Amino acid sequence: TALAGVAVILPPATVNDAWAQPGGNASKSPGHVELGQGLARIWTASVTGANPRARLAASPVVSDGRLYVVDTTARVTAFDANNGAQIWSNALEIEDDGKASRFGGGVSATSTMVFATNGVGDVAALAADTGALSWQKRPAGPLRGAPTLSNGNVYVMTQDNQIYALRQTDGEAQWNEAGPVAASGIFGVGAPAAAQGTVIAGYSSGELAAYRY
């Protein structure tokens, strides 16, 4: 093929000590990450998983020695990344009529806070060391993807192609935009990518939209 003779040049591989957001970081471009040799399982832990009515789609994240994950009941749990011991667990408060839709969402973390979303449409901020709830907002819903953290904001995308920017300190909405309405959709949305003053949202229509922040 035309590319057969093109050399692939990679920068030196680097060891990462965190994977604090889905995709590694806000830009979803962690670089050339080194994979250790002789990989082996060192611990396992369990959270409430999928069933015929609820799909577990959220991936865990790792920050400052803790692993965070949200399960299909919208419960956020922190484990010790070294040995799997549970540090704390906190279920996001949801009204009874919304509990059937609480699955979905995801988590992202900083050194001090964990931000979680759920399928009902809630965005919550919890203390990284204790799990204490700082704030919980519902800008829209449902939210089937993880949040992205950048520029002091939490960026989330809804199942119906809307993107919201919420302030990390108190959850107040800073702006929102709506993408094209698609005739059909899929379960889950990709977390927005943020870098160099731009947030990029991928919509279910297949379109990408870039917003300056």
Please report, for each region that a protein language model flagged, where it lies by residue.
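Blade/loop signatures of beta-propeller domains
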Residues: T1-I42
